[in-house]
Amino acid sequence: MRTNELILYKDMEDGELLQDMTFLMENYNNEYYNEDDMKSLLYSTIGDLTELSVSHGFEGNLWHTYLTYLMVSHENAYSTSCEIVGPVEGSINIAALHDFKIFKELFDYDFQNLGEVLGEDGLAMIRDYKGVNGHGQVFNERIRDRICDLAKALDGTKCAEEFKEKVTQFYKEFGVGKLGLHKAFRIEHTEEGARIVPITKIAHVHLDDLVGYEMAKKKLIDNTEAFVMGRKSNNCLLFGDAGTGKSSSIKAILNQYYDQGLRMIEVYKHQFQDLNDVIAQIKNRNYKFIIYMDDLSFEEFEIEYKYLKAVIEGGLEKKPDNVLIYATSNRRHLIRETFKDKEDRDEELHTNDTVQEKLSLVARFGVTIYFGRPQKREFQEIVCQLAKRNNLNLTEEELLAEANKWELSHGGMSGRTAQQFIDYLAGKTGNFSEI
């Protein structure tokens, strides 16, 4: 089936299954091979295909979906050139069309003769597979559905050129590989360096879900929108009291601008040594990346802030235009200052240098946004709006009376406290006297 002639789409992850299946296609009727061994390989391959499909949540024609999955997952010179921007000019199209002709042949392969020789049972199953629970562990339903829809569209193509056009359109709309198919990522440190790993389950929070803080949200939106649109933008620090919606606002920003090419990588301060490696992996991709640091703060003895300052400020190499850093913190100045610091400054000749070194990290964030605790009237408004969204059948007087009792024993007034109160009410069936 000419898979050994692929130019761009080679050395694919999960490609062993393709090698086994094409070997069967080419040799199922070859007398040189033992028929029982060939049957064993066929059912082993069908088993591997089924396992992969269950883990990814695939349904329908598993062979078509598997081939589609290979194409949308493989990062090569053609696919990464087309992500977000669409069709490109140049000789790379010749190599791409060559490979898509081979994939088209694989799509159109008729398994009937192979099934008559080696057995039809397993092949019938993979032609119209029904999933167990409708979702997988690797992809969320949104990604799974896009891949399955593309597989169906490719099944209807009449030529390799049309086949290539549909795959390229997918690259433009949704991207390619893990950075294209997923919204959010975390970092794993390996012996080879930093590895970017997709986060498949993320909160589906949206900015409209966050009650209040309109000025703060607008400032965050304006900066992020400028970044996504390729205009000048700044690193952003969201600071203020706990439970006021800082982290939720960041997650909401990702959900709002994902379709415009925004991606987010969560990094913890013990991973700051990997930041340069991470940036090197993403700087040439056609996406906009926010490196997200939640609850960022440093004790007086911690020096990781120096790594962060160096990355933000940059050395000889300019920080890529497609990377920003967003952080949340309960501290305005990020680094805790103690009375000992003041005593040390009394003994140090260059007192101002010591102060500036510790405070200069905040200056690296061009946009700072304050999220303060709501006043009583604002807190009550948040409670009322959340109650309305959850269809709670209490009068406003009853609701606010219970909310006041709740906040006194649950950390004071904040958006988080209001949400926890509403979640508590929504979980009860009638009696609210035990709050």
Where are these regions (language model features)?
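Conserved AAA+ ATPase "SRH/arginine-finger" region at the nucleotide-binding site
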Residues: 346-359, 366-380
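N-terminal pre-Walker A segment at the start of P-loop NTPase domains
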Residues: 199-225
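Conserved catalytic/switch belt of AAA+ P-loop NTPases
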Residues: 299-349, 353
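C-terminal alpha-helical "lid" subdomain
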Residues: 368, 372-435
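Conserved nucleotide-sensing/catalytic segment adjacent to the nucleotide-binding pocket
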Residues: 263-265, 276-320
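Interdomain "pre-motor" coupling segment immediately N-terminal to P-loop NTPase/helicase cores
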Residues: 133-196
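Walker A/P-loop
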Residues: 235-265, 277-284
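Intrinsically disordered, low-complexity N-terminal extensions of AAA+/P-loop NTPases
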Residues: 1-153
